[in-house]
Every structure is written in structure tokens, then in C-alpha cells.
Amino acid sequence: MRRKKAKRMPVLPDPRFNSELVTKFVNNLMLEGKKSVALSIFYDAIDRVSDKTGEDGLEIFKKALTNVTPAVEVRSRRVGGATFQIPQPIRDSRKLSMAMKWLIGYSRKRNEKSMSLRLANEIMAAAKEEGATFKKKEDTHRMAEANKAFSHFRF
């Protein structure tokens, strides 16, 4: 056990939308410390979303994140030689980071030409409750539902 609780690092809002959420997303998107590249990918993706839908890109991004945010997850626990998948509620900060990481991960796996195009298409799909990221959330919830019987085991 640690002696003190870890301090949360302050997150500065991004320059264009003045949003901490965007900064957190860009920090997750960043590879090898290249923040300016990550920012341009994100802004390009948001612009593409706005152009294709005719609505505010940031609002669609927020809607997409809300749609792919999980409420419960399963965690493995050994009880008497057997490993059980136990459903657990997720705290808010972890929900958000899981949603962001899923959105970025499944965007990277898509087959479009540029990362900004992949991200834009995955955001639009998630906003419409489709796509690989939304499927991942549904699968997570399905696993938790299937293992509801073991929810009396606690950590």
C-alpha cells in the first residue's frame, strides 16, 4: 500500500476549444512526445466531422465519448482454485480514460489513409452508436451481465 494518495496532475485546457477534455484526449493520442502532431490530428478530425455532419464537431466528439463510456467492467478474482470474472462499477475518471483509449485504439486499427480520417470516422460511428468502439463497450457490458451471479464476491 502506498503511504500517500497520488496527486492529480493539473491539465491545462487546449488552445482552440479551451477544453480540458480535449487536452486529455490529445495526451492519450500523442506518440513519442509529439504533442503538436497529436493536436493537428485531433483538430483535423474534428474539422472533418463538422464538414461531414454540418454540426459542431466538438459536440459530436463529446456525444461519441458519452456513447462509448462503460459503466461496469469485469475483473478476475481467484476463489478456491477457480478464476471468476466479477462485475465491478468503474469510477468516473477511469470510465473516461477507458473510453478515450478505446476510441483511439480502434481508430488506429481502421483502414483509412490518415489518422485524422480514421479518428473522424470512428468518432462519427460512435456518435451514431455503431463502430468497433461502441461494440467494445457493449461487449464489456454483456460480459458483466453474464457474470452478474458472481457480483457478491468483492475485492
Segments the model singles out, each with a brief description of its role:
Residues 1-32, 36, 43-155:
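Strongly charged
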